[in-house]
């Protein structure tokens, strides 16, 4: 068990990397205290993300990532702002590991009525919340599936974490092993079955199974050349018997370049770098998109930094 000092150091180190905390530290503490009280009283909450005209229903769970949405709002993650430079009306966004749907909601507003969002969330905990948020925002351009994506059609165990956003196909031995059986589908098959013949941006956050998802989308990647936002999570990948760099290596073989998002790209101290972070993969021929993303605040090309396994 970690000592209170170690827990504080970890929390403080995390907060210092968050753009929302640095912009408004006092407001972050006040909102966190409010969220703690809401969790004690079992009070579910709806927050407004005014920048995108989005409302988010958040279940009261102190361990859940909902507290970060509540505390940081529009500054929750730099990827949300990045969507504004790579999505526009009429485009198609695929959200793999949608959880409560914050990316789904924001993308839906950005692509408009002429566009479409396809969201996947397998968990019995999170899928009803995703559905509730779709209804809350009256989104008619979202197609949602209770399924996990992989490289082939099958079934598997999804292991629950204290925070539903950490649910994984790979078991964490430090947890109690609560699990549910979920459907696995390849993205290529789902798109074909639903007559979707365009994909512009894919976000993949599946706790280490990113490589499997991308292999199941190989035809779409080669045909549509979408921009991909994916999580680099070597610890979770190892629990699935996958290479930490498997997703990156596969995309590199398809002619993608990489941009590291946010403050993990700027940290000089390896101890303060997160053990997982997000990467944007951009087809080499999409020069304009690469320029827009690379020049966004806090981002730089992946070749200019090092992954944790290289440190």
List the predicted regions and their residue ranges:
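Core alpha/beta nucleotide-donor-binding catalytic domains of modification enzymes
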Residues: 124-127, 131-166
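S-adenosyl-L-methionine
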Residues: 1-133, 137, 194-196, 258-266, ...
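Short internal loop-to-helix segment that lines adenine-nucleotide cofactor pockets
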Residues: 71-92, 139, 155-157, 170-224, ...
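Short, conserved loop/helix-junction motifs that constitute active-site signature segments
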Residues: 107-112, 217-224, 251
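Conserved Class I S-adenosyl-L-methionine
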Residues: 244-257
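Short loop/edge segments at beta-strand edges and connector loops
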Residues: 145-147, 230, 262
């Amino acid at each position: 068990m970690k000592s209170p000092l170690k827990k504080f150091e970890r929390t403080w180190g995390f907060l210092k990397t968050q753009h929302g905390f640095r912009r408004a530290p006092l407001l972050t503490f006040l909102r966190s205290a409010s969220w703690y009280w809401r969790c004690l009283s079992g009070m579910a909450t709806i927050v407004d993300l005014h920048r995108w005209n989005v409302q988010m229903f958040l279940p009261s769970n102190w361990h859940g990532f909902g507290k970060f949405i509540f505390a940081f709002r529009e500054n929750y993650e730099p990827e949300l702002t990045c969507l504004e430079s790579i999505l526009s009306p009429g485009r198609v966004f695929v959200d793999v590991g949608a959880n409560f749907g914050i990316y789904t909601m924001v993308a839906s507003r950005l692509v408009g009525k002429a566009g479409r969002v396809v969201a996947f969330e397998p968990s019995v905990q999170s899928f009803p919340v995703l559905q509730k948020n779709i209804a809350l925002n009256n989104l008619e351009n979202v197609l949602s599936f209770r399924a996990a994506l992989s490289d082939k059609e099958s079934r598997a165990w999804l292991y629950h974490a204290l925070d539903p956003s950490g649910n994984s196909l790979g078991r964490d031995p430090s947890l109690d092993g609560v699990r549910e059986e979920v459907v696995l589908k390849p993205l290529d098959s789902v798109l074909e079955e639903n007559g979707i013949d365009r994909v512009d941006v894919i976000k993949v956050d599946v706790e280490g199974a990113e490589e499997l998802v991308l292999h199941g989308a190989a035809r779409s990647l080669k045909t549509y050349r979408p921009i991909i936002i994916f999580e680099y999570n070597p610890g979770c990948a190892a629990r699935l018997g996958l290479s930490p760099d498997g997703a990156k290596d596969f995309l590199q073989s398809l002619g993608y370049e990489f941009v590291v998002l946010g403050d993990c790209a700027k940290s000089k101290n390896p101890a303060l770098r997160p053990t997982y972070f997000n990467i944007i993969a951009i087809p080499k021929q999409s020069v304009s998109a690469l320029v827009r993303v690379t020049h966004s605040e806090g981002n730089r090309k992946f070749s200019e930094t090092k992954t944790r396994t290289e440190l």
